[in-house]
UniProtKB/Swiss-Prot annotation:
GO terms for biological process: iron-sulfur cluster assembly. Belongs to the iron-sulfur cluster assembly SufBD family. GO terms for cellular component: chloroplast. This is Iron-sulfur cluster assembly SufBD family protein ycf24. Its main location: plastid. It is found in: Plastid, Chloroplast. It comes from the Eukaryota. Signal peptide: none annotated. InterPro entries: Fe-S_cluster_assembly_SufBD, SUF_FeS_clus_asmbl_SufB, SUF_FeS_clus_asmbl_SufBD_core, SUF_FeS_clus_asmbl_SufBD_sf, SufBD_N. It holds the Pfam family SufBD_N. Keywords: Chloroplast, Plastid.
Length: 486
C-alpha cells in the first residue's frame, strides 16, 4: 500500500474508535450529603444515618484503623496522581423518605435517569426475567421483583436493607471472603461502604430470575464504595449481572468496591459484569479510578464460581476477580475482555487458589489496546500441597490496534503438589494494514472488518455472558472502538 493509502487507512481506523460517551449526563437533584473528609466521626455518622447495629460500626472502625496503617499499592502497571482522601464525599444520597413503600415515592428525576440508561424500574416497562437493584451514588433507590423472589425463599435486596432485616447473615458472611485488612482499597471500602446488593439463595433452590445491580455515580465530588455479598447454599444456583456508568467530568472520581461470593456444597454462582464507567476524554483527563476487590469462596465440594467481565470504561482499572477453591472438586472460572483506548490504563486479571482435592480452574483473558493506552494482564495460579489432582488452564491473548498502544502479561504460577497439571498459553497480535486490505479487497468496509475481527477475538468470552448481556457487550466494544484503529 502507498503512503497516501496508509494515511487514509489510519485516519479511517482512528475515526472508528473514538465515539462520544453517551452516558456522560448528570442529574440535578436535591441531595443529603456528609461533608467531604475522612475520619472516625464521618464513619460513625455514616453508620448512624443507616441505623446500623453495633457489630457493623465496630467492623467499620476496625477497618479504618487498619487502612490508616496501610500504603497505597505501587506494584501495578498504572500511573496516577496521588488521591486526596480528604477531598472526597463519602456519603451522597438523593433526599427521600426514610422508608420508600413504592416506586411512586421515588423522585421522578431518578426514575428518568435510569430510563435514559436503559434501566426501567417501573412495573409496566421493567424486564420480565431480570430483577434489578438500582444504586445511585451512596444508596439503593429501588429493587424489583423482591416479593416474587421471596416466595421461593430467595433474598435479593440492598445490603443496607439486609443489615436491618437479616443481621445474623450479614454478621456471619461479611468480611469472611475478603477480610478487612486484605488490601488498601478493600480496607477503605470496609470502613465507608454505604450500599450495594445482598443475595441469598437457600438450599435446593435455582433462582428463577437473573439478579442484577446497576451502579450510577452522579455527584462530582463523591466516590462510590458499594459492597456486594452473595451466598448460595447447598444445591443452589444463581446468575448475577452488574452494570455501571458515570457522568462526564474533568476531574477523577474514586470507585472502590468489594464483592464477596460464597458457594457451599454443589452450589453454582455465575457473576457477570459489563463495566462502562466514564473513561476520561481523548487526552486522558477525567474518568473513574476503578479499584475493585472481587473474590469468591468455593467452600463446599463440587461448588462452582464463574466470573465473566467486559471492561471498557474507567481511566484506571485495578481489578483481579479470584476464586478460593477449598471444597474438593470445586471449580473456578474467569472470562475477561478488557478494552483500553486513548490514555486508559488497565491492570487486571485473576487469581485461582487451589486447596481442595481434584479442583479445576480456567482463565481466558482477552486484552485489546488502542490509542496510547496500556493494558496489563496479571494472573496467579497457586496449587497448595494439599491440592491433589488439581488442574488449571490459562489463556491470555492481546490484540494491539495502532502503533502507540501497549500490552503486558504477567502470569505467576506456584505449584506445591506434584500431581497438579497446569497449562498456560499466550499470544499477541495486531490489526494492521494486511488484515484491513484483505477485507477491502472483498468489498467489506474498514468499520465492518475491524468489528468482525474484534468480535471473533472476543467470542470465547461473549459466549459465557448471559443472553441479556452478550449482544450489548459486542455492541459496546464496537462503539468504544469507533475511531481508533491506526
Amino acid at each position: 500500500m502507498t503512503n497516501k493509502s496508509n494515511k487514509i487507512l489510519n485516519t479511517n481506523i482512528t475515526k472508528l474508535v473514538n465515539q462520544p460517551y453517551k452516558y456522560g449526563f448528570s442529574t440535578v437533584i436535591e441531595k443529603d450529603i456528609i461533608e467531604k473528609g475522612l475520619n472516625e466521626d464521618v464513619i460513625c455518622l455514616i453508620s448512624k444515618k443507616k441505623n446500623e447495629p453495633k457489630f457493623l460500626l465496630e467492623f467499620r472502625l476496625k477497618a479504618f484503623k487498619k487502612w490508616k496503617e496501610m500504603k497505597c499499592p505501587d506494584w501495578a502497571q498504572i500511573k496516577f496522581s496521588e488521591i486526596d482522601y480528604q477531598d472526597i464525599i463519602y456519603y451522597s444520597a438523593p433526599k427521600v423518605k426514610k422508608k420508600l413503600n413504592s416506586l411512586d415515592e421515588v423522585d421522578p428525576e431518578l426514575l428518568k435517569t435510569f430510563e435514559k440508561l436503559g434501566i426501567s424500574l417501573t412495573e409496566q416497562k421493567r424486564l420480565a426475567n431480570v430483577a434489578i437493584d438500582a444504586v445511585f451514588d451512596s444508596v439503593s433507590i429501588a429493587t424489583t421483583f423482591k416479593e416474587e423472589l421471596a416466595e421461593c425463599g430467595v433474598i435479593f435486596s440492598s445490603i443496607s436493607e439486609a443489615i436491618q432485616e437479616y443481621p445474623e447473615l450479614i454478621e456471619k458472611y461479611l468480611g469472611s471472603v475478603v477480610p478487612i485488612g486484605d488490601n488498601y482499597f478493600s480496607a477503605l471500602n470496609s470502613a465507608v461502604f454505604t450500599d450495594g446488593s445482598f443475595c441469598y439463595i437457600p438450599k435446593d433452590t435455582i433462582c428463577p430470575l437473573e439478579l442484577s445491580t446497576y451502579f450510577r455515580i452522579n455527584d462530582q465530588k463523591s466516590g462510590q464504595f458499594e459492597r456486594t455479598l452473595i451466598v448460595a447454599e447447598k444445591n443452589s444456583q444463581v446468575s448475577y449481572l452488574e452494570g455501571c456508568t458515570a457522568p462526564q467530568y474533568d476531574s477523577n472520581q474514586l470507585h472502590a468496591a468489594v464483592v464477596e461470593l460464597v458457594a457451599l456444597e454443589n452450589a453454582d454462582i455465575k457473576y457477570s459484569t459489563v463495566q462502562n464507567w466514564y473513561a476520561g476524554n481523548n487526552y486522558g483527563e477525567g474518568g473513574i479510578y476503578n479499584f475493585v476487590t472481587k473474590r469468591g469462596l468455593c467452600a463446599g465440594s463440587n461448588s462452582k464460581i464463574s466470573w465473566t467481565q467486559v471492561e471498557t470504561g474507567s481511566n484506571i482499572t485495578w481489578k483481579y476477580p479470584s476464586c478460593l477453591l477449598v471444597g474438593d472438586k470445586a471449580k473456578g472460572e474467569f472470562y475477561s475482555v478488557a478494552l483500553t483506548n486513548n490514555y486508559q490504563q488497565a491492570d487486571t486479571g485473576s487469581k485461582m487458589i487451589h486447596v481442595g482435592k481434584n479442583t479445576r480452574s480456567r482463565i481466558v483473558s482477552k486484552g485489546i489496546s488502542a490509542g496510547n493506552s496500556k493494558n496489563t494482564y496479571r494472573g496467579l495460579v497457586n496449587i497448595s500441597n494439599k491440592a491433589i489432582g488439581a488442574r488449571n488452564y490459562s489463556q491470555c491473548d492481546s490484540l494491539l490496534i495502532g502503533n502507540l498502544s501497549n500490552a503486558n502479561t504477567f502470569p505467576f504460577i506456584s505449584v506445591q503438589n506434584p500431581t497438579a497439571k497446569i497449562e498456560h498459553e499466550a499470544s499477541t497480535s495486531k490489526i494492521g494494514e494486511e488484515q484491513i486490505f484483505y477485507f477491502l479487497q472483498r468489498g467489506i468496509p474498514i468499520e465492518k472488518g475491524v468489528e468482525l475481527m474484534i468480535s471473533g477475538f472476543c467470542q470465547e468470552v461473549f459466549t459465557e455472558l448471559p443472553l441479556e448481556f452478550a449482544a450489548e457487550a459486542d455492541r459496546l466494544l464496537t462503539l468504544k472502538l469507533e475511531g481508533s484503529v491506526g
